[in-house]
Amino acid sequence: MSGAMPVKRLWSRPDLLSIEWADGTLGEFASLWLRDNVREDRDPHSGQRLIDIADLPENPRIRSAAAHNGTVNVEWEAESRSATFELQWLLAQAADRSGRTDSGLRFWLEAAGLDAARDFAWATFAGARSDRTLRARWLDQLWRDGIAFLSDVPCNDAGILEAAALAGRVLETNYGLVYDVRSVAQPENLAYSDLGLGLHTDNPYREPVPGFQVLHALVASPDGGESLFGDGFAMALHLRASFPDDFEVLTRTPVPFLYRSRDAELYAERPLIQLTCSGEVSAVHYNSRSIAPLRLAARDAGPFYGAYRRFAALLRDSRFHLQFSLRNGDLVVFDNQRTLHGRTAFSSAKHPRHLRGCYLTRDSVYSEAALLRREFHPETHS
């Protein structure tokens, strides 16, 4: 296979196939896992499985395994069949199971030393719409960094929806498909005021939590109203390294989040820091404005509030803030379960400020990125 990583050596025993690639990657594949992933046992059109685990031999034993022309052929002892696996596909599986569930992410803890225009992904709206290679790269960087930007998005009603469609599918909420962020009298949400807002994630009271958020600058304020962003994963990992007990408390304590307005009441409970089954940080949910009274035993109040205060202090630390001014027509997309956002205070009486926003479903952003990756790198999806 052209461009495939060469295999340094391959060996097997009845219960295991082992492959070492030229770059040092070692893949170990259980015989039962290989038997479960035989391509011929899937429908060729949908790719869905045609068999169930109960249809497979309980303990398939490998008779032989041999590499040839970018593939490896595996024969089993008790079955009169063999299966061929693409070595590049097996390499991708080996990388995925390396134990690094955060593989491919770039953390940016001390964001104050970064420059939004220099250190993060930017594309023009027209370029991302017309150049699929550019859009694929932009989406990959969005997943890597948890944030990416577009410029020259038309400042009209349709602009944000046309731009959002380049990343994923818009999630309709009680705010509608889009919402306007500008100051109003007696706001039902402090986002619609002149107040500065500390770093937070949006809608932790919603089920599911919106995966990605989009903000489009229609009228930028020349004085105040600067955007703030911080890498919640990086700060959570910093807390874990420095104060592991506090980190553990925040991962296991359910926090109630509540939103009430004239036309909606939303409630959900989730920890401030959420982990995968393997213990890696998978989401940060932080919005002090929306926390309802906690249901804590008295003995648990001290440890939780101590950990909560310490994490809040991290989020307030300006060393961890990426601060800059969006210009008219700029648009930012960010992971609402990783990248916290906020703003500095401003005076709408002196300088009106108007952003338009929407949310994207997490699975649709993943799908857009995966489809483009598959289009330009088919060898990893064979």
Model-based region annotation:
Residues 1-131:
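Motif-centric detector for short Cys/His coordination patterns
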Residues 102-147, 152, 156-382:
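Active-site environment of non-heme Fe oxygenases that use a 2-His-1-carboxylate facial triad
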